[in-house]
């Protein structure tokens, strides 16, 4: 089923501007409460100006451009502006530190980055000292320094015409984005996402929550994540709805924002639900227009029931990952919901439960959740410059191995059991155990290290590190946590430390993590 045809992202925005004109497309609220608003026509003009900015900066079709931004309208100007000229967005998690960000720049081969003044010192240091191709920094915000290799985004953009200066030939098979995501290996892999992927995501996700043009979709999720991009933004724009982007999540402010913008659809992760539940009760907390709350794993039955009863909402479960682009298993519009099932496969997808020999398992038996789609169309195209990793995860016939375990019942409802090996889910972020272990093992006093996820009532999982010290060494908690804070993003820093004489291992030398829980 081809529901996209030949419509690339450039054609999408030109059509949206023509069809919806002055209808509100994007509302952005900053952490200070400052609101910026754009119609479909004015947003398309901002996108065109940004595309022209990139053209004037020497960016051509096929070039990779990095974005390191918190939620802001400029993220969307850049995302779609790059797509209009056939260039490729490489979003970087705004919480990453220097070493992690430099690694993504190096492996994406991006020569230009758009970032905010907050992150300028880090990228100036990367430009001068690290082995990357980065040669230009474009800064968003006031007081950009007057230095070589630095430009001011708003000044340059506002000088550009509102119509596109050059429109290279585009195909829906062209790459629009490379999104680096944590994996079970020590480093992130770049998920290659095409124009077709993003157009399909818009149609699919708008179908999933039955979006209409009179809907208002509000999200607090970070724009550099796949769920904000494909479950929320692309869905809202494809349906002609209004998309409300909040700069940062605040449990105290959330329901006021939902009421203020008369949001009809939003999305939540467990950390949000738990922090909302501990807020003081308010007589206004049920006075909202929400008809659907898109929900992503994992929540107990008691937590789910309490949240629904208190706030008068219903949860629409959706299961997916960056590689699947959208929530390929979930509750369908008008379908019955069978908690704790994650739902059934959506249109254009097949799902199966496989054993270790890649054989299909019958209902009730636990195995690996596998998804069948079309690479570059309904699922990701490949891992960037990683053919071996691509071949391991993605079969030639389109079956994707998620690494997650689950089962299905006799009626075809699927159930999630456990996360992929060596991953920790922390407040909406995926954290690779191996990546943390490699960083921590560089400490001169540490001989052996393993990290695990342990239950956290607020943020899904906390991170606990078990270390074995070199003989004769001592290590304080202050020393350990200071080392971690200097070498990894804040959300990756372990919450707990246990120093042991040894770590449990099996006969092949692998650490037995279950013995540590």
UniProtKB/Swiss-Prot annotation:
Q: What class of enzyme is it?
A: ligase
Q: Which Gene3D superfamilies match?
A: 3.30.300.30, N-terminal domain of ligase-like (3.40.50.12780)
Q: Which GO terms describe its biological process?
A: carnitine metabolic process; fatty acid metabolic process
Biochemical pathway:
Amine and polyamine metabolism; carnitine metabolism
Which sequence ranges form a coiled-coil region, renumbered to this chain? none
Please indicate if the UniProt record lists Ligase as a keyword: yes
Q: Name the InterPro entries for this protein.
A: AMP-bd_C, AMP-bd_C_sf, AMP-binding_CS, AMP-dep_synth/lig_dom, ANL_N_sf, CaiC
Q: What catalytic activity does the UniProt entry give for this protein?
A: 4-(trimethylamino)butanoate + ATP + CoA = 4-(trimethylamino)butanoyl-CoA + AMP + diphosphate; crotonobetaine + ATP + CoA = crotonobetainyl-CoA + AMP + diphosphate; (R)-carnitine + ATP + CoA = (R)-carnitinyl-CoA + AMP + diphosphate
Among NCBIfam families, the record links this protein to: PRK08008.1
Q: Which family does it belong to?
A: Belongs to the ATP-dependent AMP-binding enzyme family.
Explain the purpose of this protein.
Answer: Catalyzes the transfer of CoA to carnitine, generating the initial carnitinyl-CoA needed for the CaiB reaction cycle. Also has activity toward crotonobetaine and gamma-butyrobetaine.
Entry protein name: Crotonobetaine/carnitine--CoA ligase
